[in-house]
Amino acid sequence: MSFDSLLDKNDKLVKVCGIQTVEAAETALQAGADLIGIICVPNRKRTIESAVAREISKLIHKSGTTKLVGVFRNQSVEDVHRLSEEYDLDIIQLHGDESWPEYYNVIKKPIIKRVIFPRDVDVVTQVCQRKPLVCLPLFDSEAGGTGEKLDWSSISSWASEQNNVFYILAGGLTAENVMEAVGLPGVIGVDVSGGVETDGVKDNDKIIKYVQNAKKQ
C-alpha cells in the first residue's frame, strides 16, 4: 500500500490520534475518520493497552476503508516491526529522530514522519518528490499531543513558495479551527488528539464535530 490510493479517494485525510478505547475508535470510525491512531510509545498518558489495540484493529479492518496508524518515537526497528505485526497496523508514524527509510525498508508499510518547522523543510520537499508516495510528512510540535498550535502563518508562507509540497498538519487542532486548517496551502491531512478530549479523555461529541468540520471543505 502507498498513500497514493488513499489520496485518490480522499481530498483531505482526517486523523484522530491517541485513541485508547474501542468506543472512541468506533465513534471516529462512524464519523468518517480516514486514519485512527494509537500510541505505541511506552509509558505515555495515551499509551494503548495491547488487548485494546487488538480489538480496535479488528474493528477498523472490518470497515474496509479507515486505516490504523501506530505511533512510535525513537523505538528500534525490531520493536516497531513486532508491534506492527501484532496489531496489524496499516501505517507507521515515527515521531522522533528516526530515519524513516530504515524503518520502511524493513517493515514495508507506509510511513508518516513527524517533522519540525522550519528545521526539517528539506525532508518535506524530498519526501513529496518520491513515487510511489510511501511517506507523508507531518508538521507537529517536538513532543506531540500537547495541544500546542504551530505557526500556521509561517508554514503557509513557506508552502506557498514551494512547488508541489504537501503535509499533514497537527498541533492545537479543534473542531472550531479545523476548517481553517484544511484550507491552508499544502495541507492534505489534519491530525488531532487533545483537541477532541475533555479532561484528558476522548469526547465522542468533539470527535464527531471535528471529523464533520474537517470533511466540510
Curated annotation (Swiss-Prot):
GO terms for biological process: L-tryptophan biosynthetic process. Keywords: Amino-acid biosynthesis, Aromatic amino acid biosynthesis, Isomerase, Tryptophan biosynthesis. It catalyses: N-(5-phospho-beta-D-ribosyl)anthranilate = 1-(2-carboxyphenylamino)-1-deoxy-D-ribulose 5-phosphate. The keyword Isomerase applies. SUPFAM superfamilies: Ribulose-phoshate binding barrel (SSF51366). InterPro entries: Aldolase_TIM (IPR013785), PRAI_dom (IPR001240), RibuloseP-bd_barrel (IPR011060), TrpF_fam (IPR044643). Belongs to the TrpF family. This is N-(5'-phosphoribosyl)anthranilate isomerase. The lineage of its organism: Eukaryota, Fungi, Dikarya, Ascomycota, Saccharomycotina. The gene is TRP1.
